[in-house]
Each structure stands twice: as structure tokens, then as C-alpha cells.
């Protein structure tokens, strides 16, 4: 197969552009890791905001299994029952849990 000088030059230029682009992405990754600035700001929001997201809710509940009042249960739907943060569940399970 014969390649013209122009096609080889274009292939070389495109390869260099690809390497530069990958280098910039890698440099940004080395500085910030997997977190973008927007994600970092979201993580820093207070837990007791009006509409807490699911991840923060789960993190709070898993960290605060033992409680002395409802406030220890992140101030959300779960309540402190017998020293444990228990979600408000209806039906048979809710009756058993209190």
C-alpha cells in the first residue's frame, strides 16, 4: 500500500493532537482525581438541607446507627426507636419496629 506524503502528514498531526488532548485530560485527572468541582461542592452541602439527596441520606444513616433522639437520625424520615435510627415503614414491618 502506498500512502501519499499528505496523508502521512495528516495522520501524524492527528496523532499528535490526540496525544495532546489525552495529556490535558490526564493532567486534569491528576489535579482533581475523580471529583469535579461541582461534585465537590455538592458533597459539602449541609445534610439537613430541605431536599437531601439519597447518597447523603444513606451515608448519614449508616454512620449514625445508634441514636438518643430523632435529631441524631439526620432529621429525616427515620426516627430514633429503641436507640436505633429506623425508617418510617408501614405495614407488618412498621408494626414490629415500633
UniProtKB/Swiss-Prot annotation:
A Pfam family matched in the record: Toxin_23
Listed SUPFAM superfamilies: omega toxin-like
Sorted alphabetically, which InterPro entries does this protein's record hold?
Answer: Omega_atracotoxin_CS2, Toxin_23
Subcellular localization: Secreted
Q: Which residues form the signal peptide?
A: 1-22
Q: What Gene Ontology cellular-component terms does the record carry?
A: extracellular region
Q: What Gene Ontology molecular-function terms does this entry list?
A: calcium channel regulator activity; sodium channel inhibitor activity; toxin activity
Q: Which residues form the propeptide?
A: 24-56
Alphabetically ordered keywords of this record: Amidation, Calcium channel impairing toxin, Disulfide bond, Ion channel impairing toxin, Knottin, Neurotoxin, Secreted, Signal, Toxin, Voltage-gated calcium channel impairing toxin
Please tell me in which tissues this protein is expressed: Expressed by the venom gland.
Leucine amide-modified residues are where?
Answer: 97
> Which cysteine pairs are joined by S-S bonds?
60-74, 67-80, 73-85
Q: Which PROSITE patterns match?
A: OMEGA_ACTX_2 (PS60017)
UniProt family annotation: Belongs to the neurotoxin 15 family. 02 (omega-actx) subfamily.
Q: What does this protein do?
A: Potent inhibitor of insect, but not mammalian, voltage-gated calcium channels (Cav).
Domain commentary:
The presence of a 'disulfide through disulfide knot' structurally defines this protein as a knottin.
> What is this protein's name?
Omega-hexatoxin-Hr2b
